[in-house]
Amino acid sequence: MLLIVGLGNPGAKYQGNRHNIGFMAVDAIHRRHSFSPWAKKFRAEISEGELGGQKVLLIKPQTFMNLSGESVGEAMRFYKLEPSDLVVIYDELDLPAAKARLKTGGGHGGHNGIKSIDAHCGREYRRLRLGIGHPGVKELVQNHVLGDFAKVDRDWLEPLFDALADNADMLVRGEDSQLMNKIALALGGKTEEPAPKPEKKTVAKSHIHQARNHNQPRMPESGPMAEMLKRMFGKKDD
C-alpha cells in the first residue's frame, strides 16, 4: 500500500490558502480516479483506491498543519507501513510558483507540517514540494502562506493538478523523474535531463590520438620523423 498525504489546514476558512495546496493536489487525484468517498479515520479524511494496480490511501490530516505527523503516524502504524510507503505533498516557499520538486528524505526547511511528520514517521519518505513563491521578506511569510491564491494563479494551478492527477500512477511505480517531466511540460517548463555519464578514461592515449580518423596517412615506420611522431602520439615500437 502507498499513502499519499496532502498537507493543509481543515475548514472553509483555509480552503483556498496557498498553505493548502497539498489538500488541493490530493483532491485532484481523488477526482480523477475511482477512489472511495471521503471518510473520517486517523484524525483525517481518507479515501481508498488503486493506482497502477496498487492499493493507495489518500489522506488529508484534520489536525491542523503543525500536528500532521500525529495523524499520518497513526495511519502508518495501523497498516504497518514504512517511510518508503509514504508520499507527502505540500507547499514550498523556496520554490517559485508553478515549479515542483520530488525527492526522498531531506530536512523540513522550516515547514511545520513536515517537521511533525519527520518526528512521527521518520525522514526517508518521498516529498513532493509544490512551489508557492516567497513574498520577499520574512515578515510577510505568514500572510503569504495563509493568503488565498489569486485568480491569475489558476493559469498554472489547473495544469499542475491535471498533470499530477493524470500521471499519479507514476508515484506508485517510483517513476519520479518521469512525473517531474510531465509536470514541467504541462507548465511550459524545461524537462529534467538525465545526469550525463562520466567519460571513460583511456589509459596512455593522447586526446590528439583519439581524435584522428582512420583515413589519415600512416606514420613513417623509421627515421627522425617517425621518432618524433611516436613521442607525440604515444606509439610504441613492436
Curated annotation (Swiss-Prot):
Task: From the record, give the transmembrane residue ranges.
Answer: none
Q: What residue spans carry the region label Disordered?
A: 190-225
Show the catalytic activity.
an N-acyl-L-alpha-aminoacyl-tRNA + H2O = an N-acyl-L-amino acid + a tRNA + H(+)
Site positions for Stabilizes the basic form of H active site to accept a proton:
D91
**Biased composition, class Basic and acidic residues, residue ranges:** 190-202
Cross-referenced CDD domains: PTH
Its main localization is cytoplasm
| Binding locations of tRNA | Y14, F64, N66, N112
Per the record, a Pfam family? Pept_tRNA_hydro
GO MF annotation terms: peptidyl-tRNA hydrolase activity; tRNA binding
Assembly notes: Monomer.
What functional role does this protein have?
Hydrolyzes ribosome-free peptidyl-tRNAs (with 1 or more amino acids incorporated), which drop off the ribosome during protein synthesis, or as a result of ribosome stalling.
What is the protein name stated in its UniProt record? Peptidyl-tRNA hydrolase
- Which gene is transcribed and translated to give this protein? pth
